[in-house]
């Protein structure tokens, strides 16, 4: 199945944030490396840039929003889970035009692609809690049918 440009952007953002979490390289360095990555030409570059630079710029705020939904300190999560959760938190707060279920489903797929065997289940549970806090009207409307 062919990946959408938005999915490709999220995959590249996950790879870039993983690298940033491990190396603390600048967003410019990571951006330059991603430009040479497989699939870059098929990505939605505007979305990729918004996510990558937005998550790095707002890291502390995103961690603060995410932490109450975690069952352990964020430092104990794998770098892949952290990157995926940070991307989803950024999208939940900044891309309100994207339905929360789409954001969660994309995050689960990223965790399946890049993470450990059951990491996607954890990501799903955390984001369900977080979406209820960040988008209460939208999540309640969905639950009420």
Curated annotation (Swiss-Prot):
Phylogenetic lineage: Bacteria, Pseudomonadati, Pseudomonadota, Betaproteobacteria, Burkholderiales
Name of the protein: Transcription antitermination protein NusB
A single GO BP: DNA-templated transcription termination
Similarity comment text for this entry: Belongs to the NusB family.
Alphabetized UniProt keyword annotations: RNA-binding, Transcription, Transcription antitermination, Transcription regulation
InterPro entries reported for this sequence: NusB-like_sf, NusB_fam, NusB_RsmB_TIM44
Record-level Gene Ontology MF annotations: RNA binding
Organism expressing this protein natively: Burkholderia lata (strain ATCC 17760 / DSM 23089 / LMG 22485 / NCIMB 9086 / R18194 / 383)
Listed Pfam families: NusB
Biological role stated in the UniProt entry: Involved in transcription antitermination. Required for transcription of ribosomal RNA (rRNA) genes. Binds specifically to the boxA antiterminator sequence of the ribosomal RNA (rrn) operons.
Any Gene Ontology CC annotation: cytosol
């Amino acid at each position: 199945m062919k990946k959408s440009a938005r999915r490709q952007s999220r995959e590249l953002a996950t790879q870039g944030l993983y690298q940033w979490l491990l190396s603390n390289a600048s967003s410019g360095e990571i951006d330059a490396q991603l430009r040479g990555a497989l699939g870059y030409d098929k990505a939605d570059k505007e979305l990729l840039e918004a996510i990558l630079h937005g998550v790095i710029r707002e890291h502390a705020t995103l961690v603060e929003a995410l932490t109450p939904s975690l069952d352990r300190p964020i430092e104990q999560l794998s770098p892949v889970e952290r990157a995926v959760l940070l991307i989803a938190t950024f999208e939940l707060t900044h891309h309100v035009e994207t339905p929360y279920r789409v954001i969660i489903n994309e995050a689960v797929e990223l965790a399946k692609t890049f993470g450990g065997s059951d990491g996607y289940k954890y990501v799903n549970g955390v984001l369900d809690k977080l979406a209820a806090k960040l988008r209460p009207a939208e999540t309640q409307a969905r639950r009420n049918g």
